[in-house]
Amino acid sequence: MHAALITVTIDPGKEDEARAMLDAQVVPMVRQAAGFVAAYWLEPHDGKALSIAVFDSEENAKAGAPPAGMRPPGSPVFVESVEFHNVMANA
C-alpha cells in the first residue's frame, strides 16, 4: 500500500466553503479512485490542513492525488505539497 500525504492552505474566512466542497466533491471523488483503500482529512489548524489517502499501489496513489501547486477553479483551497510514502504498517 502507498499513502499520499497532502498539505493544503485554506483561504482565510473560507473554512466553511472548503468543508462543504470537501464533503460534496472531494470525498466522493477520492472514494471512487482506482485502488482506493482509505482516506482521512484532518481538521484545519491556522489555515493549513492535512489529508492522508491510502491506495493499493504507488501508481494508484500518484494517479489519485492532486498535484502540488494546484488550486481547483473557484476553490478556497491551495494544494501546498503532496508526498508519497510506502505504508509500513497499519492497525
Task: Put a short name on every predicted segment.
Residues 1-50, 56-68, 76-91:
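Short S/T/G/P-rich N-terminal loop/turn motif that feeds into the first structured element of a domain
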